[in-house]
Amino acid sequence: MIKDNTVFVGNKPVMNYVLAVVTQFNNGAEEVAIKARGKAISRAVDTAEIALNRFLANVDKKEIFTSTEMIDTDTGKTNVSSIEIVLTHAK
């Protein structure tokens, strides 16, 4: 997958990320990855579900990856959960 087809989910409203996903597919992307960490994970799941159920009829979930990343903070190291949801055109 090309890294340009990745949407990083943060603190903006969900519909901003849905628009980014729909735009990627409308521009000819075969796959789009939605990535998030920590508190933004639920927003990433909402983004995928809204995009699939409301806007993208011919797109399916291909893979979902979950992991834990070690992040350096002021007080040491902490674990942060992350998710990657890969959407692809249905065949």
Swiss-Prot record:
Superkingdom to which the source organism belongs: Archaea
Keywords: Chromosome, Cytoplasm, DNA condensation, DNA-binding
Primary role: Binds double-stranded DNA tightly but without sequence specificity. Involved in DNA compaction.
Any one biological process term the GO annotation gives: chromosome condensation
Location in or out of the cell: Cytoplasm; Chromosome
Organism taxonomic ancestry: Archaea, Methanobacteriati, Methanobacteriota, Stenosarchaea group, Methanomicrobia
Example GO molecular function: double-stranded DNA binding
The protein's name in its UniProt record: DNA/RNA-binding protein Alba
Cellular-component GO terms for this entry: chromosome; cytoplasm
InterPro entries the record matches: Alba-like_dom_sf, DNA/RNA-bd_Alba, DNA/RNA-bd_Alba-like
